[in-house]
């Protein structure tokens, strides 16, 4: 445990993964890898950090899987919790503690928290009608019900949230609800629940959010959309069979029965950060030290999550903390967007996913295998908008950057040091302008990279680190030591001296993203006493991030890499990549859902016949798109301005996931011109642009060369 007397402590949490399935690369890119890079950077700075995570083992998602597989919830979580924990460790996640919400400590902590809020008058108690499955004879909470989202029209929205537009929902708000257990149409039945009065807390929440202008725009934009709609009370208890039980004494205080009622998973899950911190402190032999990280104003609390969890970490959990009164509020919630795979939405149900455990097994023989995926994902993080991972892109990152740039620079430097300078650091004498410029650039990089990590621009941080390796390669090429070792031995010595200093800097700067390779590099250059980026105690007098820009290897320092140093990275061959792509396609094909292929696919069935009179009611006009721009808080929509010849129309088109604004401007399209205007996301859509949808879901504009305003018949 770090020094609890430090002037500021840093508590970092990563979203608790549901213990109902394995981890995939979308999870890693959303919350876990950015958190780990941030924490490792902070540890290298010598900060007092507690990095907390754990398995979310309560709630409907666990119960649903247990019902589907005819197993108990306990069996489900006992299967996936150790698998998730172990694969995180194999991947290099450096948690101080990884807990689980089925623990006794968590149950006690959650119930105590619930009890305090109830005693403080922090809940509203309401009796109303909820959806009930008459066949299963149970209330349908959260993901036990599916239906049409009232906000965006997505037809497979869950009872607690629409995963298409991110709207926070309750089951009774769904249109055309259906039980996911029996497919029955639910009926209404009366029940009583505790509600968190988010509406009453909105002014406090708005003031708090407004005090953090440094937060990411995608996070603040989503929060603001909820503020604009007006927050509503949210039920934080459920009538289900699995979860943290409502405390008997609290129920009795209100004349109610606690039996059959549990605390909503999104009330108990973030409390899992607190209970895990308690368990971590107890494990360190300081059971009360958890309060230093949760109840001391000198703590900086940062939540790393995916965008689907913004409402819970930016509104619900802060509301709970405010109502309790004893806890610090989050300092930042740097949520990421979604990661796509090979140009398609990642989908576990369709088999369109890269599972972490499969990657680790398939690439077990590759040198620094976890680092390869860490780097490829870190350069593709969906920080402000959705991003795409492809296996060919992975190969390019490994071969073109890790092997050809970073690895090549290190290998050439070590080889020259062994061959021409007896495996030692040669002295730097009378440095040239190129030598000084390289050292000056090296001195600047720690601050540049550090600022990017601090501002949660992780991709920029990794890019700037690799840029130093690129500059090192260019410097090596420009100074031509293969010539100067004969023509000007001191110039050659200067090149190798400076290059070795850059290698030392890179061995620290690359530590957050490439911990295995960075450690290997430090071994090869004999750089010792470097501060650790893992939860271990810092070595006394350790070299840290702040030292990375200075020369760290004195003249005469031995370089223990050996006369023929092994390349730091291996290149990934084409067959390996093709095997991964084929695995994806084969798995999707088994489920008849391969999104990457348009062959042998069923076309959508024809709609029912309409009369000629019905068709003639459509007023179809030719038009030209003159403007296209994203719609705030609506990932699927572009706002178009279309010239119909006789007037300009504003039209919202659901093509943003496939077409960039620049791809749309200038298109000559067909518009349904007599469609009734519709208000969406603060804009009035005054028509519809016709699109063809191919069997694989790709949109293709229906175009025309007719004059703007011409009738299309």
Swiss-Prot record:
Domain of life (superkingdom): Bacteria
Cellular compartments per GO CC: cytosol
Family matches, as Gene3D superfamilies: HUPs, Isoleucyl-tRNA Synthetase, Domain 1, Methionyl-tRNA synthetase, Zn-domain, Nucleic acid-binding proteins
InterPro entries documented for this protein: aa-tRNA-synth_I_CS (IPR001412), Anticodon_Met (IPR041872), Met-tRNA_ligase_1 (IPR023458), Met-tRNA_synth (IPR014758), Methionyl/Leucyl_tRNA_Synth (IPR015413), MetRS_core (IPR033911), MetRS_Zn (IPR029038), NA-bd_OB-fold (IPR012340)
Enzyme Commission numbers on file: 6.1.1.10
Cofactor: Zn(2+)
Motif ('HIGH' region): 17-27
Record: residues binding ATP: 348
Subunit relationships: Homodimer.
Protein name (database record): Methionine--tRNA ligase
Organism name: Salinibacter ruber (strain DSM 13855 / M31)
Gene that encodes the chain: metG
């Amino acid at each position: 445990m770090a020094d609890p007397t430090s002037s500021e402590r840093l508590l970092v949490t990563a979203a608790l993964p549901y213990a109902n399935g394995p981890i995939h690369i979308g999870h890693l890119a959303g919350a876990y890898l950015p958190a780990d890079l941030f924490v490792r950077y902070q540890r290298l700075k010598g900060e007092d950090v507690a990095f907390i995570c754990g398995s979310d083992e309560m709630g409907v998602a666990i119960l649903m899987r247990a019902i589907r597989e005819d197993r108990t919830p306990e069996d489900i979580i006992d299967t996936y919790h150790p698998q998730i924990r172990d694969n995180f460790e194999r991947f290099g996640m450096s948690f101080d503690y990884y807990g689980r919400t089925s623990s006794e400590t968590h149950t006690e902590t959650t119930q105590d928290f619930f009890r305090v809020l109830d005693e403080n008058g922090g809940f509203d108690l309401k009796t109303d009608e909820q959806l009930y499955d008459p066949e299963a004879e149970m209330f349908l909470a959260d993901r036990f019900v599916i239906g049409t989202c009232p906000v965006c029209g997505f037809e497979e929205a869950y009872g607690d949230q629409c995963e298409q537009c991110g709207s926070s929902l309750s089951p009774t708000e769904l249109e055309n609800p259906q039980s996911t257990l029996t497919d029955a149409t639910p009926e209404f039945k009366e029940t009583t629940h505790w509600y968190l009065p988010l509406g009453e807390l909105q002014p406090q929440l708005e003031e708090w959010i407004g005090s953090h202008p440094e937060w990411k725009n995608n996070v603040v934009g989503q929060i603001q959309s909820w503020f604009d709609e007006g927050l509503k009370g949210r039920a934080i208890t459920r009538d289900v069979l699995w979860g943290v039980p409502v405390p008997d004494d609290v129920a009795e205080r209100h004349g109610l029965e606690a039996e059959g009622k549990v605390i909503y998973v999104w009330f108990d899950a973030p409390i899992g950060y607190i209970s895990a911190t308690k368990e971590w402190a107890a494990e360190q032999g300081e059971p009360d030290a958890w309060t230093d990280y949760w109840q001391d104003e000198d703590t900086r609390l940062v939540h790393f999550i995916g965008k689907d969890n913004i409402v819970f970490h930016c509104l619900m959990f802060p509301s709970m903390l405010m109502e309790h009164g004893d806890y610090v509020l989050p300092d930042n919630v740097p949520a990421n967007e979604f990661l796509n795979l090979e140009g398609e939405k990642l989908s576990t149900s369709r088999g369109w996913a890269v599972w972490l455990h499969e990657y680790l097994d398939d690439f077990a023989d590759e040198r620094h295998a976890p680092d390869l995926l860490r780097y490829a994902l870190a350069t593709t993080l969906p920080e402000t908008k959705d991003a795409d991972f492809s296996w060919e892109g992975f190969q390019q990152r490994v071969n073109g950057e890790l092997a050809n740039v970073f690895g090549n620079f290190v290998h050439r430097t070590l080889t020259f040091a062994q061959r021409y300078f007896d495996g030692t650091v040669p002295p730097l004498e009378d440095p040239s302008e190129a030598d000084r410029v390289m050292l000056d650039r090296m001195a600047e990089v720690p601050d540049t990279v550090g600022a990017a990590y601090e501002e949660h621009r992780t991709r920029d941080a990794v890019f700037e680190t690799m840029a130093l390796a690129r500059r090192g390669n260019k410097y090596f090429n420009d100074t031509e030591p293969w010539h100067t070792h004969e023509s000007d031995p001191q110039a050659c010595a200067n090149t190798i001296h400076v290059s070795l200093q850059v290698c030392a800097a890179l061995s620290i700067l690359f530590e957050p993203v490439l911990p295995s390779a960075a450690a290997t590099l430090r071994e090869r250059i004999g750089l010792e006493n470097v501060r650790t980026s893992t939860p271990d105690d810092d070595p006394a007098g350790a070299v840290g991030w702040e030292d990375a820009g200075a020369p760290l290897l004195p003249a005469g320092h031995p370089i223990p890499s050996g006369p023929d140093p092994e390349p730091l990275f291996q290149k990934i061959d084409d067959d390996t990549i093709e095997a991964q792509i084929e695995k994806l396609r084969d798995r999707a094909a088994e489920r008849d859902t391969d999104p990457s292929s348009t062959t042998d696919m069923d076309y959508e069935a024809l709609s029912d016949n309409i009369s000629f009179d019905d068709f003639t009611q459509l007023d179809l006009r030719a038009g030209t798109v003159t403007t296209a721009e994203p719609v705030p808080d609506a990932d699927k929509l572009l706002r178009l301005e279309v010239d119909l010849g006789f007037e300009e129309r504003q039209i919202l088109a659901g093509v943003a996931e496939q077409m960039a604004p620049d791809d749309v401007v200038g298109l000559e399209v067909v518009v349904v011109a007599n469609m009734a205007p519709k208000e969406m996301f603060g804009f009035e859509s005054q028509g519809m642009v016709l699109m063809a949808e191919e069997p694989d879901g790709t949109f293709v504009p229906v175009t025309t060369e007719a004059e703007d305003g011409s009738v299309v018949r």
